[in-house]
């Protein structure tokens, strides 16, 4: 299985983020415009949290709060668990499954370099399985029919 760095290389676009003082509506607009389900919360180049669509639904929509008046700091998950570029994706998958995470911010020497989603991990698993199938077919066909 690949590393976090290789999964990040498959992604395109800029790092999507908001500030903790921004209103939730800004985080939702970023998610909609960039077709993502979470945004990192970064203040002064420091990761302070992550906010997801689920956070917004449960902490803003359900209680009847106004997304235009509610700061991201009120709904974000502060001090999120992070991973490093050289971490194996298999470890990320295990952590996501065990802790119920769908997104993991990636830090390199304390600097935010991206975010890994469960979708990124699944794509990598599928690529690995496809390679395994190709290898097995090649092995089986090597000797021809009937071996």
Regions found by a protein language model. Name each.
Residues 1-147:
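Tandem CBS (Cystathionine beta-synthase) repeat/Bateman regulatory domains
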């Amino acid at each position: 299985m690949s590393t976090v760095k290789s999964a990040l290389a498959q992604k395109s676009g800029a790092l999507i983020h908001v500030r903790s003082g921004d209103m939730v509506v800004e985080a939702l607009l970023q998610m909609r415009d960039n077709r993502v389900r979470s945004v990192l919360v970064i203040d002064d180049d420091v990761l302070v949290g992550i906010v997801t669509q689920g956070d917004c639904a449960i902490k803003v929509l359900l209680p009847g709060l106004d997304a235009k008046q509610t700061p991201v700091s009120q709904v974000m998950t502060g001090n999120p668990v992070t991973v490093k570029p050289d971490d194996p994706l298999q470890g990320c998958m295990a952590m996501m499954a065990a802790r119920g995470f769908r997104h993991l911010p990636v830090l390199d020497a304390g600097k935010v370099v991206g975010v890994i989603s469960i979708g990124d991990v699944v794509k990598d698993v599928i690529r690995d399985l496809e390679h395994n199938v190709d290898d097995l077919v090649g092995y089986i066909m090597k000797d021809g029919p009937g071996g």
